From Swiss-Prot:
Heptamer of 7 subunits arranged in a ring. Interacts with the chaperonin GroEL. The gene is groES. It comes from Borreliella afzelii (strain PKo) (Borrelia afzelii). GO terms for molecular function: ATP binding; metal ion binding; protein folding chaperone; protein-folding chaperone binding; unfolded protein binding. It is found in: Cytoplasm. This is Co-chaperonin GroES.
């Protein structure tokens, strides 16, 4: 994997892929899937005082937050820590 280190109060998140099948078993084509706003924290910036999440946390972030980047053909976001609205506990 490319070594991307967010700066300051930014966080790198791997976006959770949208479901490819409905509950009833119908397949959803790639172009019809909705973008999720849930992801996993991959890396955090150096300003740890302002960052309340840690690597490995599953988080909910604002819908239009951050800058999209592709790493190894997977969608990721680099966003400010304040754009994360919740930690999802399993």
């Amino acid at each position: 994997m490319k070594n991307i280190k967010p700066l300051a109060d930014r966080v790198l998140i791997k976006i959770k892929e949208a479901e490819s099948k409905t509950i009833s078993g119908l397949y959803i084509p790639e172009n019809a899937k909705e973008k999720t706003n849930i992801g996993t924290v991959i890396a955090i910036g150096s300003n740890k005082e302002e960052i309340t999440v840690k690597v490995g946390d599953t988080v909910l972030y604002e819908k239009y937050a951050g800058a999209a980047v592709k790493i190894e053909n997977k969608e990721h976001l680099i966003l400010k820590a304040k754009e994360i609205v919740a930690i999802i506990e399993e």
